[in-house]
């Protein structure tokens, strides 16, 4: 069996003593307490020694208690003056009592029946009673005397005289826990020690001096157990979800996408709905599905030509469409709201101008009324994007979406279902299979309708998607509650795995 120098020394000395108090063993080995404790614990893990620990509650005097042990308890000092004078005022007691002691002791003298209290000429007067003249040593006095004689006494011994809480209440004594440790050699340890152990001091560090002198050839180096349990270290790292978003962004840029950015979380309904060919009477524009700003209520519309084309698309249609057939309201389009989906930025970018062919994306915070649960939030992130080009079709879109789910989220199974959105045709919903939650919807996609793209100045196909990136993160981070992404739980933040 392999033992370190300190373990060998401790075992040899323990074999001489057979059983010893820990402090005695420390003295016998000449090592410090930490080294002996470490050696004992290792010997115990190897079955060569046993460590016994016995904890006991003890009571000891506080600084106040030590003062009382020297000059007497306040009530006895006050009673001494009363016995001498028979009757005293509070000013008389101030000669022997501090301000802190005076008020409680007056009450205590009356409670013990040692003095009566009355007013004379507007002053409080204390007069000694028969009980005060005959007062004898009490339990608290005996306990104080006992504590003064010894440095510490077991609580059980003190409580044969008085409850320790009574002493603590008067700040005479305090309670502590002491642990007595005893170390005992086992038969296996005794057998090994009797065989003879070679004590050769070990070197734990290879120094330049050892190398220069050549002594490194003669000394014995301490062996290190690389499998020994050690304290876990939690180095600084990015918030797991934030790190995931950064890697999504980097991956999309590597795939040739250009990031669309915007400073504000607030949009006009024009960009959130109207520019996307969503009619003003659509139920998704009501308070049940979107938030509205109370103040300021309205913003500004973009250039007149763009507004006129959007209005025409809604009222009469573009690209062979008949439109929605209603009177479009610019006042409704000017209303302000927290962004409900990242597609609003896609509309802005298309109106601003794009490269053809071109690929664009954005990661944005969006807001929607919902019931909070483990798969739904009212404030969350979306990855929205689009690809614009001459020969794009629906199959290209499905390929991009599947690549997202499999390569970026790590989903094993993906399925597509037909869906409806006012601004895409055809439209599709994408879901992926989560091992805990089953099929989880990620988002929607489709080909932007020509009524939308023509109004924004684009006359080639545009395939687009909006994906709930928070739900993708659930797959990659291995969690089954979306709320953990924004959690302050230190345990989760420390243990959450870093993604690829």
Curated annotation (Swiss-Prot):
GO molecular function: ATP binding; magnesium ion binding; phenylalanine-tRNA ligase activity; tRNA binding
The keyword DNA-binding belongs to this UniProt entry's keyword annotation: no
GO cellular component term, pick one: cytoplasm
Pfam families documented for this protein: tRNA-synt_2d
Residue positions binding Mg(2+): 425
Cofactor requirement: Mg(2+)
Top-level taxon: Archaea
Keyword Metal-binding: yes
Alphabetical UniProt keywords: Aminoacyl-tRNA synthetase, ATP-binding, Cytoplasm, Ligase, Magnesium, Metal-binding, Nucleotide-binding, Protein biosynthesis
GO biological process, alphabetically ordered: phenylalanyl-tRNA aminoacylation
Enzymatic reactions: tRNA(Phe) + L-phenylalanine + ATP = L-phenylalanyl-tRNA(Phe) + AMP + diphosphate + H(+)
Cofactor annotation remark: Binds 2 magnesium ions per tetramer.
CDD domains (alphabetical): PheRS_alpha_core
Protein localization: Cytoplasm
EC number in record: 6.1.1.20
Binding sites annotated in the UniProt record for L-phenylalanine: 343, 382-384, 423, 448
Oligomeric and partner information: Tetramer of two alpha and two beta subunits.
HAMAP family membership: Phe_tRNA_synth_alpha2 (MF_00282)
Family indicated by similarity: Belongs to the class-II aminoacyl-tRNA synthetase family. Phe-tRNA synthetase alpha subunit type 2 subfamily.
This protein's name: Phenylalanine--tRNA ligase alpha subunit
Lineage: Archaea, Methanobacteriati, Methanobacteriota, Thermococci, Thermococcales
Gene that produces this protein: pheS
């Amino acid at each position: 069996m392999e033992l370190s120098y300190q373990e060998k020394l401790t075992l040899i000395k323990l074999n001489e003593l057979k059983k010893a108090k820990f402090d005695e063993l420390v003295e016998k080995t000449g090592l410090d307490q930490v080294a002996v404790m470490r050696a004992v614990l290792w010997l115990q893990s190897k079955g060569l020694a046993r460590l016994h620990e016995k904890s006991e509650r003890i009571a000891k005097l506080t600084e106040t208690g030590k003062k009382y042990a020297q000059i007497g308890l306040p009530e006895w000092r006050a009673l001494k003056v009363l016995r001498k004078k028979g009757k005293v005022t509070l000013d008389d007691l101030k000669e022997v009592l501090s301000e802190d002691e005076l008020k409680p002791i007056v009450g205590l003298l009356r409670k013990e029946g040692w003095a009566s209290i009355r007013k004379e000429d507007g002053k409080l007067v204390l007069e000694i009673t028969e009980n005060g003249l005959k007062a004898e040593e009490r339990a608290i006095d005996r306990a104080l005397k006992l504590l003064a004689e010894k440095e510490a006494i077991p609580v059980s011994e003190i409580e044969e005289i008085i409850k320790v809480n009574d002493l603590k209440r008067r700040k005479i004594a305090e309670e502590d826990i002491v642990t007595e440790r005893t170390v005992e050699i086992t038969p296996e340890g005794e057998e090994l020690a009797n065989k003879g152990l070679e004590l050769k001091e070990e070197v734990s560090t290879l120094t330049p001096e050892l190398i220069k002198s050549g002594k490194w050839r003669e000394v014995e180096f301490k062996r290190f157990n690389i499998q020994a349990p050690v304290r876990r270290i939690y180095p600084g790292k990015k918030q797991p979800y934030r790190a995931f978003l950064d890697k999504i962004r980097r991956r999309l840029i590597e795939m040739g996408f250009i990031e669309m950015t915007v400073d504000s979380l607030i949009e006009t309904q024009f960009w959130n709905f109207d520019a996307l060919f969503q009619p003003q009477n659509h139920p998704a524009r009501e308070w049940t599905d979107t938030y509205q700003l109370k103040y300021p209520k309205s913003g500004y519309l973009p250039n007149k030509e763009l507004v006129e084309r959007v209005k025409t698309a809604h009222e009469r249609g573009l690209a062979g469409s008949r439109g929605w057939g209603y009177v479009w309201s610019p006042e409704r389009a000017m209303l302000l709201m927290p962004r409900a989906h990242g597609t609003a930025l896609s509309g802005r970018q298309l109106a601003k101008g794009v490269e053809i062919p071109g690929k664009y994306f954005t990661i944005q915070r969006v807001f929607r009324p919902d019931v909070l649960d483990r798969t739904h939030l009212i404030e969350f992130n979306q990855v929205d994007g689009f690809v614009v080009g001459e020969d794009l079709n629906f199959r290209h879109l499905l390929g991009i979406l599947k690549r997202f789910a499999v390569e970026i989220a790590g989903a094993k199974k993906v399925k597509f279902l037909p869906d409806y959105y006012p601004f895409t045709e055809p439209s599709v919903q994408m879901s992926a299979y989560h091992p805990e939650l089953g099929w989880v919807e990620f988002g929607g996609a489709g080909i932007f309708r020509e009524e939308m793209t023509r109004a924004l100045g684009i006359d080639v196909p545009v395939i687009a998607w909006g994906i709930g990136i928070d739900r993708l993160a659930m797959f990659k981070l291995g969690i089954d509650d979306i709320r953990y992404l924004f959690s302050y739980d230190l345990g989760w933040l420390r243990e959450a795995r870093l993604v690829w």
